[in-house]
A protein has these predicted regions:
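Bacterial extracytoplasmic/cell-wall-associated proteins, especially those involved in peptidoglycan
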Residues: 4-138
Length: 138
């Protein structure tokens, strides 16, 4: 999975928006490897494209990503210290360049291990399954 990082020798300052996106990716998929993390980032990009809002606004929309339910940035910044954070920050920095086709332009997903599917997934067929996440285009 190619992510464009630009000049690898520059030091980047991480913006608040990039932190929000990276934390969302980490909270949702850090155990899913690079493919799973890319997939979640692609869903964020797809929602931003469809809803005409920024990717960080997508992440913070009420009840969209459970990691943010009742939490603030300071409560979750510790995730930026896990080994997968470097890749998540790279995805966050380049979110508008990601291939949304990677997940079939999916705008929803859920963990496949959930005992009960979310209400919106009932009767829907996933466009893709990557790791332990099923992806849907609704």
């Amino acid at each position: 999975l190619t992510v464009f990082a630009g000049d690898g020798h520059k030091n980047f300052t991480t913006t608040k928006a990039e932190k929000i996106i990276a934390i969302t990716i980490l909270a949702e998929a850090r155990g899913e490897g690079e493919k799973g993390m890319y997939a979640v980032a692609a869903v964020i990009a797809q929602r931003a494209n469809e809803r005409k809002i920024t990717p960080s606004q997508v992440c913070l929309q009420r009840l969209q990503f459970s990691c943010w339910n009742g939490k603030k940035l300071k409560n979750l910044e510790h995730l930026l210290k896990v080994p997968q954070a470097k890749y998540a920050l790279l995805l966050a920095r380049n979110v508008s360049l990601l291939s949304r086709d990677y997940v079939g332009y999916a705008n929803h997903y859920h963990a496949t291990w959930m005992k009960k599917k979310p209400y919106w997934a009932k009767g829907q067929k996933p466009v893709k399954t990557i790791g332990q996440h099923a992806f849907y285009k609704l």
